[in-house]
Amino acid sequence: MIDRYKHQQLRIGLVSPQQISAWANKTLPNGEIVGEVTKPYTFHYKTNKPEKDGLFCERIFGPIKSGICACGNYRVIGDKKEDSKFCEQCGVEFVDSRIRRYQMGYIKLACPVTHVWYLKRLPSYIANLLDKPLKELEGLVYCDFSFARPIAKKPTFLRLRGSFEYEIQSWKYSIPLFFTTQGFDTFRNREISTGAGAIREQLADLDLRLIIDYSLVEWKELGEEGPAGNEWEDRKVGRRKDFLVRRMELAKHFIRTNIEPEWMVLCLLPVLPPELRPIIQIDGGKLMSSDINELYRRVIYRNNTLIDLLTTSRSTPGELVMCQEKLVQEAVDTLLDNGIRGQPMRDGHNKVYKSFSDVIEGKEGRFRETLLGKRVDYSGRSVIVVGPSLSLHRCGLPREIAIELFQTFLIRGLIRQHFASNIGVAKSKIREKEPIVWEILQEVMQGHPVLLNRAPTLHRLGIQAFQPILVEGRAICLHPLVCKGFNADFDGDQMAVHVPLSLEAQAEARLLMFSHMNLLSSAIGDPISVPTQDMLIGLYVLTSGNRRGICANRYNPSNRKNHKNEKIYNNNYKYTKEPFFCNSYDAIGAYRQKRINLDSPLWLRWRLDQRVIASREAPIEVHYESLGTHHEIYGYYLIVKSIKKEILCIYIRTTVGHISLYREIEEAIQGFCRACSYGT
């Protein structure tokens, strides 16, 4: 549908029988109206042509071949010179065959049928509006009992039957005579209603505004009563109040959307376009049909049987008619939602038929598979892995994916730079993956962002833009800081990559969708680019050194025991003197040369003008040297003093991991300060 703002949208809801017939009906030049499917047949077994008025009828749903009618006549589509748009012999319209994807038909039901979604699904909307138990309504719909509708204040059939034992003795003689009168069946049908027709009558008699008013008054009365002191009664009152709120909201929705409650009971059953329930011929001449066709055939068979009982056989017992109405109701239920009433219907191979609900719901349903999650051009999908060396706004794209996504741009680049004379030569170079191809591909990718999406896309940060770079392997590399926005981790998650084609899409990606432009949560405003997953583990490993300071494992070798009753593994344990480094570059160089480990403690020279925060005043040890200098050793730092007790230098106890982390933080702060200075 198109709303008043010209936005395309899809709305699922109830429609009137008039709207259903308007969707399907077509008027032929001879005045005949077609659109109703009356026969349960599909194709003729000899001619392989659709049966007239059947489930694939060309008069109702349009021609199988564009511009060719059932007779074989051909006319140019859209030719204004042609007077008639319909074939005079077969009544098929000369239009494009794609009309069979959206042209609907309908089945005129011989009896009203409740829509099983609004009756059996929880909460039951019909039971909510009528304020009646669901079991009672189900018994009424499936003809287990009847609904009384007395037409006068005088004693009627139902009143007489209900008060038979309480009236005077003379009624015992008059009632049997009354039951055997000639017009009793007509009188009974006038007073007794059963099946979905009874539900439709009750829904049609509803005044939605009165429902809202009465429900509101009752809700206020229950609220004024207060707690009764009985837990069971208080829960019962609470459930009733919740029910009244739901009933008022439902009634307001019907009023706001101009939907009549009786539309929940079907008189016309829409028939899907044929292309949405196809019959396909496979190898060997066998036909493979959609389950929807078989369920439609079952509805038509039972509906036609009911029509015959009502029209041709005047003396049909009422119980037989009620039984056939129940069969029609069950057939429509199976078509709409197979298995909702218990055991699902199965075919001859014990396979459950896929109903309309099964076709549209779930991950493989019509909406999620072919509309929301359909495959599009210029897109790919792969597993994500961590890219620790990437910038926040970059992503690593595998060569195999990149060369396919940017193939069109790559061909244009090869031709423009005269590396290929035409498209064929360019494609040949791409297939052979010549070195020049990768150079041109890198140039193309530098100015073209890509969009990464992880399903389900629950908020706008589920799709973000990145600057792609080529990486080896077959996995997409992602910066770990952007994982929280995607709700992704690196345990096998997959992400889709899309290439924005138009200039508007590329500009929007660069200005609004780049990952470094989306650092805050759009819901609560908190930072969303925070360390998670692998980054937390990496930070822990980087900074996990010996946290107990110089005292650890130095004076108490028994600390190396795993248990008090176990022996020391290394009885020759000796304290290893930590190395001294003048600057962080020497320490990192020693780590790269594998002279020290990432978490090995070391002494790093500290600047005298920088303050060291001490946790204790007295030194743990004091080492004196022959020249008179001495070293005062504290928990996490060391001070070298002269004979005159002047501070010569300070060393702090740290690890290569801490040094690497602090250098990264320092570079980030300096870069931020430079950016701010450029901005001012």
UniProtKB/Swiss-Prot annotation:
Recorded name of the encoding gene: rpoC1
Q: Which UniProt keywords apply?
A: Chloroplast, DNA-directed RNA polymerase, Magnesium, Metal-binding, Nucleotidyltransferase, Plastid, Transcription, Transferase, Zinc
Assembly notes: In plastids the minimal PEP RNA polymerase catalytic core is composed of four subunits: alpha, beta, beta', and beta''. When a (nuclear-encoded) sigma factor is associated with the core the holoenzyme is formed, which can initiate transcription.
Per the record, the major location class is: plastid
Instruction: Summarize the protein's role.
Output: DNA-dependent RNA polymerase catalyzes the transcription of DNA into RNA using the four ribonucleoside triphosphates as substrates.
Which reaction does this enzyme catalyse, per its entry? RNA(n) + a ribonucleoside 5'-triphosphate = RNA(n+1) + diphosphate
Subcellular location per UniProt equals: Plastid, Chloroplast
Q: Name one GO biological process term.
A: DNA-templated transcription
> How does the cofactor attach, per the note?
Binds 1 Mg(2+) ion per subunit.
What family does the database annotate? Belongs to the RNA polymerase beta' chain family. RpoC1 subfamily.
The protein's name: DNA-directed RNA polymerase subunit beta'
Question: Which cofactors, if any, are listed as required?
Answer: Mg(2+); Zn(2+)
What is one term from the GO cellular component aspect held by the record? DNA-directed RNA polymerase complex
- Which Enzyme Commission number(s) are on file for it? 2.7.7.6
